[in-house]
Design a protein with these regions (language model features):
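The feature encodes the CheY-like receiver
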Residues: 58, 86
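Short amphipathic alpha-helix used as the core "switch/output" element in two-component signaling
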Residues: 42, 63-75
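Active-site residues of response regulator receiver
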Residues: 54, 82
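C-terminal output helix
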Residues: 88, 106-116
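Conserved acidic segment of CheY-like receiver
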Residues: 5-15, 21-25
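Acidic catalytic/metal-coordinating carboxylates
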Residues: 36-37, 61-64
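Acidic, metal-coordinating helix/loop segments flanking the phosphotransfer/catalytic sites
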Residues: 34-50
Length: 128
């Protein structure tokens, strides 16, 4: 929808991280929705253009969220942003369909570039 502000969901259990990302993303022109749990995000998925997803969440992990998105057939690009960057986590995230995998702390411009690319109306979606 031309002219519509892209909606980015931030799913992270750490409030300081959510708030910092909210400030950054709003300043960059995104509409931001904050969630502390994967289950809360999944209950409010409608209208989200892209999600920044932590892997280690209470209850439903980031991996669980990715699997739930796939099971629903939800076409929401996922940017994994984790403080626990391991080769296994990277491989599993990308295998689960993450479009970008970034480590905390992340450079603001790196994150914004990924989001602008993935939330653009012309962004290509991977085919199943």
């Amino acid at each position: 929808m031309p002219g519509r502000t892209p909606v980015v969901a931030v799913v992270d259990d750490e409030q300081p991280v959510r708030r910092a990302l909210q400030r950054l993303l709003r300043a960059a022109g995104f509409d931001v929705r904050l969630f502390a749990t994967g289950a809360d995000f999944m209950a409010h998925l409608e209208g989200v253009d892209c999600v920044i997803l932590d892997l280690h969440l209470p209850g439903m992990s980031g991996f669980d969220v990715q699997e739930a998105l796939a099971a629903r057939g939800a076409d929401v690009p996922v940017v994994v942003l984790t403080g626990n960057d391991t080769p296994a986590n990277r491989a599993r995230s990308l295998a689960n369909g993450a479009r970008a995998y970034l480590s905390k702390p992340v450079d603001d411009e790196t994150l914004l570039h990924a989001l602008r690319t993935l939330s653009s109306p012309t962004a290509t979606r991977p085919r199943p």
